[in-house]
Amino acid sequence: MKETIFEKKCVDIWISDHSVGADKIVNRLKEYGRFRNVTFISSREVVYSKKTSDKVKNLFYYGFGHNYSSDLPDYDEVIFHGLSVFSCGLYFYLNKRNVNTKWSSYEEGILSYDTDLPGGKSVKMLDAVFSIMGKKKIRNAIEQYYCVFPELKRRSNKSNTWEIVKIPDFNYNNGRIRDILALVFDFADMDIKQKYIFFTSSSDWDGRPYGEKEMVLKIADIVGSENLIIKKHPRDKNEYSLKNITTMNSDGVPWEIFQLCSDVAGKVLITVDSGSFLSVSAIKESNAKGVFIFPMVQDKRAKYECFVRRDKNIRDILDHLHAMRKCQDILILSELESLKTI
């Protein structure tokens, strides 16, 4: 967005420690030099605090913007994805200063289009407090939503009043863009020999297991472990090397960066429900094939409402992309044996 919509605008960017290696990315963004200020936010410990006393303290300290200093700029627009005590606190603080700020949201990958401003219990509590105080809730202050495919957002969310703003198409084959992404994420091209790349999730470690590791081992038996490499989710602690399956050593580099900056022609990208390669394949032709395999564990996923919703969302989004003549080589498989013919 800084290279397109906000190319000539003065922009600050805040990055939280929810992402692996965020502190290093902050330093590289400073080196990139296109932002006025690049700020690192330590928010993970606050958002995921366990003790009730800490949650209450954080709710009122951060949720009402007491952590923001008086020299904070009067921003014309704040753009964010997802609600937390930090975004609510910034909203409350700038409103208290009578700053006429426009509040906007943006997509976080193509599978986020069916979700409007996710937020936890703390945000709901702040919403209630703001209502009692007679103040507009932050989610009701949103005016715009930035995304690559406005038609998909309008299709998923017909009831909101947001102005849908298209993020301009971009030439991701441009050498300069690859150089910027490689700089910011400290990316060096990897010569992957394996034909099949599996993207794991963190479901086993987030309390919603459905047998993903067992699926990986079955795939290794079908295609050969020597032909399979694993791109692990940052929170996935499963060990695959004991089964002679190679794990990609990417040091926290998102797959999206790899696919945008590398040649993945001829590869077969496999996942239960990750949207990583779908998001990139929708905006850049890569000559790779992709398969979702959630139908094969649908009975185990059915007890989790979030997975039922996600599986339906994947089907809907993929059908719509196919109708747009995009992602024609990305399919939903109902049996693993079909991998041998892809």
Predicted regions mapped to residue ranges:
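Structural motif
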Residues: D76-I79, K102, K195-Y196, K267-I270
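Short His-Asn-centered micro-motif
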Residues: M1, W14-D17, F80-L83, Y106-E107, ...
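Catalytic binding pocket for nucleotide-activated donors in carbohydrate/polymer assembly enzymes
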Residues: S276-I342
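Short, aromatic/basic amphipathic alpha-helical patches
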Residues: A22-R34, C88-R97, L117-K124, E239-T246, ...
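A nucleotide-sugar donor-handling region in carbohydrate enzymes
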Residues: E107-I197
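Conserved catalytic-core segment of nucleotide-activated headgroup transferases in glycan assembly
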Residues: R176-D186, D191-D236
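Donor nucleotide-activated moiety binding/catalytic core segment of transferases
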Residues: P234-I283
